[in-house]
């Protein structure tokens, strides 16, 4: 478990994200069953569990890419979605857009525009959506590329980059909008082991800087080292959660079995 200056439960803790009694169905399949969770400012939460447990759907509901079928979603105490007479109601478009600026999302398959350079991939949303002046947008992008070891790639196209470099560009793009919370949906699942280490080092550094993050991952050792809290999901519910020490030392036979089956990434000691 990482060292953190934040202690959950203190009066000045800020809940950046709250999800209360969230439900989601696809046809007759209940994917999320009454899920409730909250994330404090500066907290790193990893979500683990078998495929089909609802982890990615939970992230997509949290980021409003999927419409919830029930429950409540709040960012910094402000409602983005709530339930009225059994139906989910979302905030008006302008309010929803403002609340969406609170978070950034890094996908497992990079989702870069292939016909844009690295620089344009990072700055396009800043300029077009956020109305940031082009000069400021470029300055933000250049600073992030420098921090992520990609300063010499700003004029390159995605096809000219390795998978690890593409994912670092995706992280830079998310960070450029200065979100309060970052979501990662299995950020290394499309990478080979060497490139996986490259990307996980970047996320570990963000954790050291107290960036609030929710990370869906199968990298057990990484989750143990980087997280304040680990959530185990299965069959659309949160079956167990706690500190890394609590999860990795649990008496819950199913959780022990799952963790034991995934040796995953062995984090480098720094």
Predicted features along the sequence, with ranges:
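A short, proline-enriched helix->beta-strand linker immediately N-terminal to the Walker B motif
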Residues: 176-180
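The feature captures the beta-strand-to-loop junction immediately N-terminal to the Walker
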Residues: 48-50
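Conserved ABC ATPase signature
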Residues: 157-161, 165
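Short coil-to-helix segment of the ABC ATPase nucleotide-binding domain corresponding to the Q-loop/switch region
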Residues: 116-124
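ABC ATPase "signature
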Residues: 241-242
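Conserved ABC ATPase "signature" C-loop
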Residues: 235-236
